[in-house]
Amino acid sequence: MAIRETLKGGKGEVIKNPKVFIDPLTVFKDIPFREDILREVAIAVRYFVKNNMKFSTLFLGLTGTGKTFVAMYMFNEIQEVKKEDGEYGVVSQAYVNCREVGGTPQAVLSAITQRITGEEVPKHGINLGEYIERIKENLVDKKALIYLDEVDTLIKRRGGDIVLYQLLRANADISVIMVSNDINIRDYMEPRVLSSLGPTIFFKPYDAEQLKHILSIYSEYGLIKGSYTDEILSYIAAISAKEHGDARKAVNLLFRAAQLASGEGMIRKEHVDRAIIEYEQERLIEAIKALPFHYKLALIASMQASDVITAHKIYSDLCNEYKQKPLSYRRFSDVISELDMFGIIKVKIINKGRAGGIKKTIEVADKEKITKALEEAMQLEYEDTV
C-alpha cells in the first residue's frame, strides 16, 4: 500500500512541481542579483540588432554564480521579443555547450552551423573555414547571436582559439557571448584573439542571504507549503555559501533533500546531510570526466596497481594501446600526486629502511563509481578521435 501512495503522490509528499528544479526558466520572470548584468547585455543586443554594432563578451565566474542561467534567460527573452519586434526577426540564435558537443573545433563549429542553418552538418571531413562560410552564406541580410557555454573546453583544444578568432572577425553580422568558470581562460588565448574580445563580465559569488532568497523562490514554486522551514533554507544556504556561493549546489541540495523526505511530509536536517554526501559523490564523478586524457589513463592504471611503479608500467602499456607518448616516470608520479590531492586516490609512502628505500602505494576508494565515470569519460575521448 505504501508504494501505491507513493505512486499517487499522497500523504507526506514534499515536492509540488519538480519541473521548477529541472527547468527553472519556466518559473523565474527575472533573475535576482543579476539585473545589472542582464541590462548591460540587453543594451548590447539592442545596439547589435538596431544599430549594426557587433559585440562579444565573456561571462566569467565560478561554478553556480548564474552565468549559464543569465545566458539562457537572455536567449529565451530574445525569442519572445522576436514575436513582438519585427527588427528582431532577422536574428538567428545558436546556443552550444562546447563540452557537451565534444569540445573539438570541428564539433563546436558543426553544432553552431547546424543551429544557424537548420541543416545537418558533419563533424568531420570539413575544414574550419568551410563551416564559417556556410554560416556566412546563411546570414545574408540576417544576424546571428552565438552562445558558447563552457567555452574553456574549446579554447584548451588545439585550434580552439582560432575558431573564436574566425567567428569574431568574420565578415558577417555575428555577435558572441562566451561562458567560462575558468578564471584563467584568457591565458589560453592568443593576443589576436584577446584583442578581438569585448569586455569580460565577472559574476561574483552569492552570499548566504542571497542564496537563501534564491532557495525561497524555488521552494515557493516547487515545494508544498509547510514541508520546509526557514531554518532548513538557511542551513543549505550557509553550506553553499562556504563553497564560493554556489547557487547550483544549493538548489541541487534542496531538491535532493526534498526527494529523500518524500512520504515524510517535512524536510529535516538529516535529509540535507544525506543529500550533501550524495552530492559530493556525484561531484567526484564529474571531476573524473573533466580530467585530461593522460590523467584518466593514470587513474585507470592506478585502479589495477597497488604501487606507483607498477601503475606506471600499466599506464605505459595503455599509452601504446591509445597511440600516445607516455609521460616520464617523474611526470607520471606528479600526476599521481595531483590525483591524490584531488581526493580521487590515496597515496601512502612506506619507508622500507636504508636498504629497502621508499615505496609509494596506491589506494582507490569506491572503485565502482570511479570505474563507471571512467567508462563514460573514455567513451567521450574515443568519440572525439573518430
Swiss-Prot record:
Keywords: ATP-binding, DNA replication, Nucleotide-binding. It holds the Pfam family Cdc6_lid. The keyword Metal-binding does not apply. SUPFAM superfamilies: P-loop containing nucleoside triphosphate hydrolases, Winged helix' DNA-binding domain. GO terms for molecular function: ATP binding; ATP hydrolysis activity. InterPro entries: AAA+_ATPase, AAA_22, Cdc6_C, Cdc6_lid, ORC1/CDC6, Orc1/Cdc6_arc, P-loop_NTPase, WH-like_DNA-bd_sf. ATP binds at residues 65-69, 206. Coiled coil: none annotated. GO terms for biological process: DNA replication. Disulfide bonds: none annotated. Signal peptide: none annotated. Belongs to the CDC6/cdc18 family. Involved in regulation of DNA replication. This is ORC1-type DNA replication protein 3.
